[in-house]
Regions:
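Regulatory modules associated with amino-acid/nitrogen control
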Residues: 1-83, 87-96, 134
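Short amphipathic alpha-helical patches
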Residues: 34, 38, 121-128
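Structural preference for solvent-exposed beta-strand-turn elements
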Residues: 63, 110-116, 120-125, 134-135
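Short, compact, well-ordered microdomains
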Residues: 85-114, 118-120
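Predominant activation on well-ordered alpha-helical scaffold segments within soluble catalytic domains
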Residues: 95, 127-130
């Protein structure tokens, strides 16, 4: 199924869900890819960047990632998933979402996956973010 592409329907049906836990961002060298495969239960995302592999992971892997990366681990973040199945070609959903969060002074890191869009917001602002999204 291709998912919803109409912006009004997407906004009406997005039903943001606050996921349990704290999440972090880090980067590791590409040579660590096989090592990462042993920790997939706590990894939400791996993205290849020119500087290395950008990793989003749960708090349970914080110590492991600290050993694998020589760089700063960023977080904690809360994860809000938009439960509507959005079409990857849909126009405007993330623009609306990030705009309403920006107006509340809430930073957001968004990841669009195959079925849903996912928002990482500062953990201490998670309830504020949910309230802002409810305005849409």
């Amino acid at each position: 199924m291709a998912g919803e592409s109409d912006l009004e329907r997407l906004l009406d049906r997005m039903e943001p869900a606050l996921m349990e836990g704290k999440f972090y961002f880090a980067t590791v060298d590409e040579s660590q890819l096989l090592t990462l495969s042993g920790y997939l239960d706590g990894i939400l995302s791996v993205f290849r960047e020119k500087e290395g592999l950008g990793i989003v992971f749960s708090e349970s892997l914080k110590d492991v990632m600290a050993r694998l990366t020589g760089k700063e681990i960023i977080g904690p973040f809360a994860l809000i998933s938009l439960t509507v199945h959005s079409n990857l070609y849909a126009i405007g959903l993330l623009a609306k979402v990030t705009d309403v969060l920006a107006k509340e002074g809430i930073s957001v890191n968004a990841i669009s996956a195959y079925y849903h869009d996912h928002l990482f917001v500062p953990y201490e602002r998670k309830e504020d973010a949910m309230a802002a999204l409810a305005k849409l």
